[in-house]
Amino acid sequence: MLIIENLEIEIAIPIYLVENFVIKTVPNMHTVCNIRGVLEKNLGETILTDKKDMDIHIKYKGNTVFRGFVEEISIYSSADVHYFELKAYSYSKKLDNKEHTELFQNIEKTYGDLAREVVRRYSGDISNYNIKDKEIKGPVLCYKESAWAFAVRMASYIKTFLYPGMEYDKPHIHMGIHTGNMIEPGGIISESRDLIKKTENKSRIEYRLRTYNSYDIGDNIALDNKILTLYKKEVEFTKGELIFNFQGVEKSYIQDMIYPLENENIIGLSFMGKIKKYKDGKVYLRLDIDKKEPDYGFDWYPETGNVLYAVPDEGEKAQLYIAGMDTGDMYVVRTFGSKGSDENKKQLEVGKKSLTFSKEGISFIADDILTVNDRRFKLTGNGDVNISAAGKLTIKARNIRLNSKEEIVYISK
């Protein structure tokens, strides 16, 4: 541990001197800490691997100003003086390590509930502060998003921010801004005001404060007959001085700064699942991506266009199509009778993107369905379907039909 007056730095390397550090906390971002200094001795190359991910805890007057883990560290020596630089992040960054995919169908749950569920899957947790949570309007898809990114997106739907919590040596998130203290700023080095104009009739004042005193995000300050809430914080140690930089706005403007975030990657996706129930024109689907029992009945549009004629059976496979980014903008577009009684609808389902013919046999890898039986062979793709051969390709049938909505092009090379 290194102690500099009221400043304590707990870390598992022998620090002789800290030249400077900067800690930045802004909404919806992991807090980052950059430190430069001098070591008591050269720890050798093992520090580059052994000390990565080690805990670092910085306190001022006994209160935590940063808690996180070291992600990058470098050492260089000059005249037997061993300098180091390191970059550390709040433990919330651990929530970015893996991608998650799941469809949340229970519309009685709130956006905060969904964020907490996903975060807890990855050994994290969320505390709520002054949020106006609300139930989801329809099924919500988390598709290849980290737990942190998904939680940020859910927070945006209820017009609030996420902040990394630094109470523990594990991922913890604060959703919303806690109600802080009313402060009388002291030790002011400088202050400024920025007028930020959003539209002709709408603007806000951002207050910047540079001070020797430490405050918390969520604390309030009276200025120009307005109560401003501190929502950004930077801690700076340089030339032996510890300085705190803050930004504040009127709390009512914070919601105006937040816009719903969307996952653009979901548009046009389709997911296979099994029909568990068909009721009142709605299809209840257990998806292959998460294997959860269904809570929501989806509209569906059969390829025949005749909903009454093409009533799906329980146990059939079906495809859920994601039409847009809005909550619940999805429906069932087709069914496949792999478990039904119609022998013409037997199917083979496997993997991702190609159909291969070789001397070893035939292998099929696709997101869609290859239908095979004694009387027909059907290959359907959501996008392009390509069949190629190094030698001769023969197609033989009593009747051969080529049908195109736009054009048929013959190319000979």
Model-derived regions: residue spans:
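Surface-exposed cap/loop segments at beta↔alpha junctions
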Residues: 44-126, 139-140, 155
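Short beta-strand-centered interaction patches in the first periplasmic/extracellular domains
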Residues: 83, 90-92, 130-194, 329-335
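Short, Lys/Arg- and Gly-enriched loop/turn segments at beta-strand edges
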Residues: 63-69, 226-235, 325-335
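Short coil-to-beta transition motif at edge beta-strands of beta-rich domains
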Residues: 46-58, 213-223, 316-318
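Long, charge-dense accessory insertions within large macromolecular proteins
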Residues: 198-290, 298-302, 307, 321
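Short, solvent-exposed secondary-structure boundary/capping segments
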Residues: 74-89, 236-249, 283-285, 342-346
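Right-handed beta-helix
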Residues: 154, 161-164, 212-214, 274-279, ...
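Juxtamembrane "anchor/assembly" segments of surface/extracellular structural proteins
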Residues: 1-49, 89-93, 160-163, 167, ...
